[in-house]
């Protein structure tokens, strides 16, 4: 875990604001940098290998200098986030539409939304769930980025990944998609069995 934090200013401190920020060094297990160093024809393969090793080693921060691999990784994470959010929002729409619309019309919105939620959840489960990249998010916060040793990089636009626990996120979209599935099966049974 990163060794950064806020410390209160003591009585002998010159900071009159009551709280100052101090920089503390990161340990070597917190941050890994995939440097953009071209050594031969297989440089891209080497970058991909280094990134894969860093993801599997579960570093807290991963800085990706090579633009192509950084952009691909950021897009992959963005697509996974989109699938997650779509599964949650569509499932929520499926479950709450019957409460907001008349019974005769609610299934025209809730059933497609439920199917969309289940499809996104299934696709996420197949393509992203076991990928080590799904444990990371792209960091955009300037303050958090200022804590990292980015001054040593040769690239002006590195992609910075931060490891985050996604257990609650997966539970949320799986629970909502499962509830949407139950609702859809029940509603289809009611529509066609009666």
From Swiss-Prot:
The chain crosses the membrane at residues 88-104, 111-128. Keywords: Membrane, Mitochondrion, Mitochondrion inner membrane, Transmembrane, Transmembrane helix. Residues 1-23 are annotated as: Disordered. GO terms for cellular component: mitochondrial inner membrane. GO terms for biological process: inner mitochondrial membrane organization; mitochondrion organization. It is a multi-pass membrane protein. It comes from the Eukaryota. It is found in: Mitochondrion inner membrane. This is Transmembrane protein 11, mitochondrial. The lineage of its organism: Eukaryota, Metazoa, Chordata, Craniata, Vertebrata. The gene is TMEM11.
């Amino acid at each position: 875990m990163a060794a950064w934090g806020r410390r209160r200013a003591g009585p002998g401190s010159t900071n009159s604001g009551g709280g100052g920020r101090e920089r503390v060094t990161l340990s070597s297990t917190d941050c890994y940098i995939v440097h953009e160093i071209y050594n031969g024809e297989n440089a891209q393969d080497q970058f991909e290998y280094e990134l894969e090793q860093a993801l599997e080693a579960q570093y807290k921060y991963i800085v990706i200098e090579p633009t192509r691999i950084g952009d691909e990784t950021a897009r992959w994470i963005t697509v996974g986030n989109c699938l997650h959010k779509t599964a949650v929002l569509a499932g929520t729409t499926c479950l709450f539409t019957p409460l907001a619309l008349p019974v005769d019309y609610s299934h025209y919105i809730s059933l497609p939304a439920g199917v969309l939620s289940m499809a996104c959840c299934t696709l996420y489960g197949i393509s992203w769930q076991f990928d080590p990249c799904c444990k990371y998010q792209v960091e955009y916060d300037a303050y958090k980025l200022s804590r990292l040793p980015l001054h040593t990089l040769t690239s002006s636009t590195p992609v910075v990944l931060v490891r985050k626990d996604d257990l609650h996120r997966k539970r949320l979209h799986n629970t909502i998609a499962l509830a949407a599935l139950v609702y859809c099966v029940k509603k289809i049974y009611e529509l066609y069995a009666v």
